[in-house]
């Protein structure tokens, strides 16, 4: 009798074990993509960076590779942009591959890199064109291969572009020019150090500057000359201008690198007390220069946010979604009032220079 009872108990235990096992799935729980990093405290820093998009609930439909093409690999601005793109790749679960010409601003190299990316079978291309017209044939090749192209920072003037991610360069330049005219009290001789005249970025910024300068009768634009976004080029230009005529009141450079090169030439000539300088990027060194009194202003472009939003837009398109024709970010004047806020934001992303 005892053995019979024991047998019944054991059978009951076994049955309960089986039913308990059926209540648990043998498939592991779905792993979510890593969450986006917590946004820094609200400051004057780039809006797109502060409000970084949250990671998707599930991984993308396939293992996408997105090429991010910049104009050079050494300038801090482009390092920030690539960092934002890589951050998006981690958050959104896609592979991001950087392409940058060995020679800064080289159209030939960038064209070859687009062709290489097509051959490698990338799923999308985010590109900051070195030459807005010259890059069009390469973009058309990507179009023909069925690869969506997103323009970042600089517009392309042809081919099919899914969206442009970046600042409104002309409007931003107008705002910066207004600030500089205020610093001059509406009077003075001004020099513009342009970027690459073949790039739409440079064209738009020069247009923005000249729009405002021409509206102020007390302002004289004495020279507007390309420095190709290079510090040493800008320094040489300023050295030559100073030798010809040192009567300069302000320098408006189209990026921080050229602003700092211009300042160095002015400093060597003992003219920094008489001339105010502005840049365009809101990069770490530019912000530090503003706080040190070397520059009076720059323009926030939110490079980190540009890279992030470019990759995010590419993924949205690859997944069959739609994006705005122009994803606008950045556009605030960086001055002594908010430069430290920008430095704090860069530090939160691991950049101190």
Task: Walk through the language-model features, giving the residues of each.
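Positively charged n-region of N-terminal signal peptides that target proteins for export
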Residues: 1-10
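Hydrophobic core
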Residues: 10, 14-18
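A residue-level marker of the well-folded mature domains of exported/periplasmic proteins
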Residues: 18, 22-353
């Amino acid at each position: 009798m005892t053995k019979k009872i024991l047998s019944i108990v054991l059978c009951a235990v076994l049955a309960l074990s089986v039913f308990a096992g059926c209540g648990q799935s043998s498939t592991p729980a779905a792993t979510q993509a890593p969450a986006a990093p917590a946004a820094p405290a609200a400051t004057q820093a780039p809006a797109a960076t502060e409000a970084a998009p949250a990671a998707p609930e599930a991984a993308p439909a396939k293992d996408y590779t997105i090429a991010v093409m910049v104009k050079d690999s050494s300038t801090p601005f482009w390092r920030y942009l690539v960092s934002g793109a890589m951050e998006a790749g981690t958050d959104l679960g896609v592979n991001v591959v950087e392409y940058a010409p060995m020679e800064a601003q080289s159209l030939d190299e960038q064209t070859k890199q687009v062709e290489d990316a097509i051959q490698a079978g990338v799923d999308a291309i985010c590109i900051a064109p070195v030459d807005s017209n010259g890059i069009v044939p390469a973009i058309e090749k990507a179009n023909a291969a069925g690869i969506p192209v997103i323009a970042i920072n600089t517009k392309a003037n042809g081919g099919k572009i899914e969206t442009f991610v970046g600042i409104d360069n002309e409007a931003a330049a107008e705002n910066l020019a207004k600030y500089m005219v205020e610093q001059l009290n509406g009077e003075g001789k001004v020099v513009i150090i342009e970027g690459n005249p073949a790039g739409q970025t440079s064209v738009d910024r020069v247009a923005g500057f000249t729009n405002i300068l021409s509206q102020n009768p007390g302002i004289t634009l004495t020279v507007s000359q390309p420095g190709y976004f290079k510090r040493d080029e800008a320094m040489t230009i300023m050295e030559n201008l100073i030798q010809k005529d040192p009567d300069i009141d302000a320098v408006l450079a189209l990026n921080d690198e050229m602003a700092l090169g211009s300042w160095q030439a002015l400093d060597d000539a003992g003219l920094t007390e008489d001339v105010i300088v502005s840049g365009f990027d809101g990069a770490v060194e530019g912000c530090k220069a503003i706080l040190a009194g070397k520059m009076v202003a720059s323009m926030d472009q939110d490079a980190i946010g540009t890279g992030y939003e470019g990759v995010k837009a590419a993924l949205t398109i690859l997944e069959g979604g739609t994006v705005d024709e122009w994803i606008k970010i950045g556009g605030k004047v960086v001055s002594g009032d908010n430069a430290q806020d920008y430095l704090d934001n860069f530090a939160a992303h691991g950049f101190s220079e």
